[in-house]
């Protein structure tokens, strides 16, 4: 293994250059966006998509690309398929979805008859409530 070491005299000019390059402000950190980077990205975005919606803060990745989603990501899955989720469909869904997401189950109605029966139940509840209110006001 061969190695070479060069020695040069130390000058004041070199000292000032070292201070400039070793200062914390001059270190490039890809996760920090500088004002210059933000202005350049803003100009590029306005030129490429002049009629686009304004950017949501925190909706960009470190490389400046726009995300097509906003965290927290919720995927809605019908409760009737929750059994399928526990085995294969849900695993495949989360595997193919490129971000961390949670699956939220929701109740779905299979027919309009259920909706009509709910409406009838609501009307009967209102009538019962009115009967109780009239009952209480009669004694007062």
UniProtKB/Swiss-Prot annotation:
Short sequence motif named WRPW motif, residue ranges: 28-31
Major subcellular site: nucleus
This protein's UniProt keywords: Developmental protein, Nucleus, Repressor, Transcription, Transcription regulation
InterPro entries reported for this sequence: Ripply_fam
GO biological-process terms attached to the record: embryonic pattern specification; negative regulation of DNA-templated transcription; negative regulation of transcription by RNA polymerase II; regulation of skeletal muscle tissue development; somite development; somite rostral/caudal axis specification; somite specification; somitogenesis
Keyword DNA repair: no
Tissue expr: Expressed in the embryonic anterior presomitic mesoderm and in newly formed somites.
GO CC list: nucleus
Cellular compartments annotated: Nucleus
Region (Disordered): 107-126
Keyword Repeat: no
Oligomeric form and interacting partners: Interacts with gro2 via the WRPW motif.
Miscellaneous: Named after the expression pattern, which decreases in a posterior to anterior direction in somites like a ripple.
Family assignment from sequence similarity: Belongs to the ripply family.
Function: Plays a role in somitogenesis. Essential for transcriptional repression of the segmental patterning genes, thus terminating the segmentation program in the presomitic mesoderm, and also required for the maintenance of rostrocaudal polarity in somites.
Free-text comment about domains: The ripply homology domain is required for transcriptional repression.
Protein name: Protein ripply1
